[in-house]
Amino acid sequence: MEISTKTLHFIEEHREDDTRTLALQSKKYPDVDMAAAVTQIAGRQVAARKIPSWYPVSALWYPPHLSMEQCSSEATALYKASLLEGDTFADLTGGFGIDCSFISRNFKQADYVERQSGLCELALHNFPLLGLGHIRIHNRDGVSYLQEMLPVDCLFLDPARRDGHGGKTVAISDCEPDVTVLEPLLVDKAKKVMLKIGRAHV
């Protein structure tokens, strides 16, 4: 993702402005990529309340608003991190990287696996800015990575809890990936496996 200097300045100057109003003013700022600016401003505004330790790092890049609203909060990520530690860690459903970023601090080496190239690009940019140079980025499907990876101390998965039409799933087996099928392999590849699932799946 490339953001011009003028757009970066605009983002900084308008970081607290209403993004809906800004989106309607693109003609006033022809040298600004307004779509990118609005995405980043909205992302920082969500981060201010959801990931407060990230907010002061102005150079971070953020995904579209829906991804920000759906990602883990700093508070829940810190709780997960408090339960895990060791030498090697892998997050097979990396997403925006909130969980990976906080959990990985308790490990010497970490692997972030995500099949969406756009999210991998954000992780590649953001992790070094957060002092997380020990995380390796893999733009791959988590299941195929799991099948080939070396064993680790801990695996983390956050299965998608919505179907292809956007509806919420009810059974764990309906989530993506289906961890009920992967269970033998997960146990074989890690000393500990942490899954993030919704209340409806318990």
Which stretches of residues belong to each language-model region?
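SAM-dependent transferase fold signal centered on methyltransferase-like domains
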Residues: 1-202
